[in-house]
Amino acid sequence: MVTAMVLINVQRGQINETAQRLLEVDGVAEVYSVTGEYDLVALLRFQNYEDLASVVTSHMQQLPTITKTHTLMAFQCYSRADLQQAWDIGIV
């Protein structure tokens, strides 16, 4: 599984519309409105890098309300759910 976070800036007043349109794209799992330098953070999950690249370079760039993106690739996931499962089956 390939996971990426895309930090997104959008045109003024277009946060809600852009978030909804992003959620229509296959592979976009979640979209958050955030404070700070960026307006939205999209969490993307794909089976391969080619599909991720297609969404970031083609689909997202076709949305006229998106003015800037910055993509972060995830190397490893640390989560409470994973840790709890490890304890439950005696790995840890």
Regions found by a protein language model. Give the residues of each.
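A compositional/biophysical signature of low hydrophobicity enriched in polar/charged and small residues
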Residues: 1-92
